[in-house]
Curated annotation (Swiss-Prot):
Localization terms from the record: Cytoplasm
Gene Ontology process terms (BP): trans-translation
Source organism: Bordetella pertussis (strain Tohama I / ATCC BAA-589 / NCTC 13251)
Name of the gene encoding the protein in the UniProt record: smpB
Similarity remark: Belongs to the SmpB family.
Protein's job: Required for rescue of stalled ribosomes mediated by trans-translation. Binds to transfer-messenger RNA (tmRNA), required for stable association of tmRNA with ribosomes. tmRNA and SmpB together mimic tRNA shape, replacing the anticodon stem-loop with SmpB. tmRNA is encoded by the ssrA gene; the 2 termini fold to resemble tRNA(Ala) and it encodes a 'tag peptide', a short internal open reading frame. During trans-translation Ala-aminoacylated tmRNA acts like a tRNA, entering the A-site of stalled ribosomes, displacing the stalled mRNA.
Keywords: Cytoplasm, RNA-binding
Record-linked HAMAP family: SmpB
Chief subcellular location: cytoplasm
Name by which UniProt lists this protein: SsrA-binding protein
């Protein structure tokens, strides 16, 4: 079950490989995420010291958050992957033009997981081509739907 999607990711990047990772979260973060108080829009994934981290994910603390800690809404969160996957990702990210983009947060067996992808940034003309292609597909479906209705009415 998806908690939140980063719809901007497919608009701004060509998605190549998808990965799923666990996250190191604090108790107040889990409660806030379950309440839907999370945003992935400006977040990104980085590789630092052989480990992978999620930066910029905003988790708004609940008003009933613990009083003995100070919630940091945009703290850096470590992603949990197998060592082999991390090595493979480091090799791919070091290639020019590739980056790691968070796609969505979801539950898996009661745990909160992050789907992220290896992506290449789209240029402005790529975004226009993608939009043009989507419009064309929509138009084709509309015309086909209209034609089938006309044919059914005639017979």
């Amino acid at each position: 079950m998806s908690i939140i999607d980063n719809r901007k990711a497919t608009h701004d990047y060509f998605i190549e490989d998808r990965y799923e990772a666990g996250m190191v979260l604090e108790g107040w973060e889990v409660k806030a995420i379950r309440d839907g108080r999370v945003q992935l829009k400006e977040s990104y994934v980085i590789v630092r010291d052989g480990e992978i981290y999620l930066l910029g994910m905003h988790v708004s603390p609940l008003p009933t958050a613990s009083t003995h800690i100070r919630p940091d809404a945009t703290r850096t969160r470590k992603l949990l992957l197998k060592a082999e996957e991390i090595r493979k990702l480091i090799g791919k990210v070091e290639q020019r033009g590739y980056t790691l983009v968070p796609l969505n947060l979801h539950y898996k067996n009661g745990r909160i997981k992050l789907d992220f992808a290896l992506g290449r940034g789209k240029k402005l003309y790529d975004k226009r081509d993608t939009a043009r292609e989507k419009d064309w597909q929509r138009e084709k479906e509309r015309v086909l739907k209209h034609d089938t209705r006309v044919n059914q009415r005639d017979s």
